[in-house]
């Protein structure tokens, strides 16, 4: 039985198969190795991938894109709200969760983000099965380093609903290093590796220390304001200006025309990673006018010059954060489709002139390739010594809410970046004259204030003997294992009564 790895990104999805000692990305039914993470609802059918992306121009309100942004989030989550604002498909609140409102004329229904992700996972499963000629169920799935518990849970549910048996979830930077075998070839050596990922809607930079075959994250940062879509939008705006210059028509306010230009700009952007120029042709762009425009790589680089600067600054900030000079970095691994852009690669090379830059595996394929290798390891198809190669640290802050009148005081039990396994304990004080105590646990990325949406678990101690005076000490112990599972124990120190919960995590 083959092992596969699946990467579901914000704009694209990709599946790799581990077979005969190596991992390879497999092409979908359109012959493409990367599939747009787009789902379209038509009157008689649901379409996924390139067909859905191409039909979005005429079916925008029933086409869902960037579902990963909203997956596992509450309706009121700031990131979900940003997604809702930008979505052409109407999103409504149902039971505190966001739902897509689909109306094809034939049917009206609400669709959850998990339902959409399930359809994309099903497409990946079909792609792998078509390539292998047999059924496939076992999978390793990749997740961003900053994915919270609720997001990972939603992703796992979507994959399971698609018929997958999840062997493990693996962090994207970890998968990238596995793809290149970093730490395998010299398991006793020590090195620092920068993982640079420029995806469709975000940029992440991660510094990893590799020592004795173990990966340890020194620092990581994610920037949601910059991604491959930004380059596409910049090029589309340029094309709109060219159309106006030639035909004296400003189409920037025409959503349909701009969507056509976005599709053409996206194709041109990809072509310019390998060609010196690309032709942008749009049939009947506006008012029956066929638009034809050639864009050179030099022009594209000029149009996107400010974006390139935004893509490089995070590297400098990360180096400053960990106290490194460029010469302290031994390797740079490129991930994400937009990391293919030659100008970006050159700018990174200029920062690290003496450092090995790894891009022999296509950047948009390196993460699923690493996931497939991990799947092969777990199924015993590869040297199991490699199973020690894993990122061992917490991805976000774990906090407990203090029991006080304000209701807004939190204590960090486990900071993000803590090496795993880890055990932390904290004593909370509750009024002695109560018979039950509810302890609430929250998760935070450290960038925004802690809100109710951040709560991921609670432990209740019941039937406690009331005290006539004083306070009650509650010992809270949080243990996070290497696999990401959480074990939380709360004990009343007076009576010894305790409760424990376990939150499993396949990452």
Swiss-Prot record:
Gene3D superfamilies membership: 3.30.30.30, 3.30.420.40, Actin, Chain A, domain 4, Substrate Binding Domain Of DNAk, Chain A, domain 1
A GO term, aspect molecular function: ATP hydrolysis activity
Cytoplasm is among the record's keywords: yes
Biological process (GO), any one: protein refolding
CDD domains for the chain: ASKHA_NBD_HSP70_HSPA14
Pfam families assigned: HSP70 (PF00012)
GO cellular component: cytoplasm; cytosol; nucleus; plasma membrane
Keywords: ATP-binding, Chaperone, Cytoplasm, Nucleotide-binding
Keyword field contains Cytoplasm: yes
Subcellular localization(s) per the UniProt record: Cytoplasm, Cytosol
UniProt-listed PANTHER family: HEAT SHOCK PROTEIN 70KDA
Family the UniProt entry places it in: Belongs to the heat shock protein 70 family.
Assembly: Component of ribosome-associated complex (RAC).
Record function comment: Component of the ribosome-associated complex (RAC), a complex involved in folding or maintaining nascent polypeptides in a folding-competent state.
Entry protein name: Heat shock 70 kDa protein 14-B
């Amino acid at each position: 039985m083959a092992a596969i790895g699946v990467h579901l990104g914000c704009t694209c999805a990709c599946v790799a198969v581990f077979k005969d000692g190596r991992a390879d990305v497999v092409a979908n039914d359109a012959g493409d190795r990367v599939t747009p993470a787009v789902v379209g609802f038509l009157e008689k059918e649901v379409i996924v991938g390139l067909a859905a992306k191409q039909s979005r121009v005429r079916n925008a309100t029933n086409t869902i894109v960037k579902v990963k942004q909203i997956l596992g989030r509450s309706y009121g989550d700031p990131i979900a709200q940003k997604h809702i604002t930008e979505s052409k498909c109407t999103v409504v609140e149902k039971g505190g969760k966001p739902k897509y409102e689909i109306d094809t004329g034939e049917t009206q229904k609400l669709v959850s983000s998990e339902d959409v992700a399930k359809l994309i996972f099903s497409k990946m499963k079909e792609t792998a099965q078509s390539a292998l000629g047999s059924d496939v169920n076992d999978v390793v799935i990749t997740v961003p380093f900053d994915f919270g518990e609720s997001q990972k849970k939603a992703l796992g549910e979507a994959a399971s609903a698609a018929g997958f048996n999840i062997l493990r979830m693996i962090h994207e930077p970890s998968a990238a290093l596995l793809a290149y075998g970093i730490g395998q070839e010299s398991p006793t050596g020590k090195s620092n590796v920068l993982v640079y990922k420029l995806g469709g809607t975000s940029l992440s930079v991660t510094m990893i220390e590799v020592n004795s075959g173990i990966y340890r994250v020194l620092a990581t940062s994610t920037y949601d304001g910059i991604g491959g879509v930004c380059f596409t939008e910049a090029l589309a705006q340029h094309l709109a200006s060219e159309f106006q210059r030639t035909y004296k028509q400003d189409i920037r306010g025409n959503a349909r025309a701009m969507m056509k230009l976005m599709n053409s700009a996206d194709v041109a952007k990809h072509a310019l990673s390998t060609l010196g120029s690309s032709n942008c042709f749009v049939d009947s762009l506006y008012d029956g006018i066929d638009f034809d425009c050639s864009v050179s790589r030099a022009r594209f680089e000029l149009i996107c010059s400010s974006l390139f600067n935004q893509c490089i600054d995070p590297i400098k900030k990360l180096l400053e954060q960990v106290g490194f000079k460029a010469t302290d970095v031994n390797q740079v691994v490129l991930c994400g489709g937009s990391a293919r852009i030659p100008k970006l690669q050159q700018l990174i090379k200029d920062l690290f002139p003496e450092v090995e830059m790894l891009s022999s595996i296509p950047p948009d394929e390196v993460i699923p390739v690493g996931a497939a290798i991990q799947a092969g390891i777990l199924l015993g198809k590869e040297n199991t010594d490699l199973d020690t190669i894993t990122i061992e640290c917490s991805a976000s802050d774990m906090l407990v809410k203090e029991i006080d009148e304000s209701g807004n005081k939190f204590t960090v039990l486990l900071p993000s970046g803590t090496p795993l396994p880890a055990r932390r304990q904290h004593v909370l004080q509750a009024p002695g004259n109560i018979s039950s105590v509810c302890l609430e646990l929250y998760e935070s990325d450290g960038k925004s204030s802690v809100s109710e949406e951040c709560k991921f678990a609670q432990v209740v101690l019941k039937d406690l003997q009331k005290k006539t005076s004083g306070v009650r000490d509650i010992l809270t112990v949080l243990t996070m294992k290497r696999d990401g599972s959480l074990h939380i124990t709360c004990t009343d120190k007076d009576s010894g009564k305790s409760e424990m919960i376990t939150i499993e995590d396949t990452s």
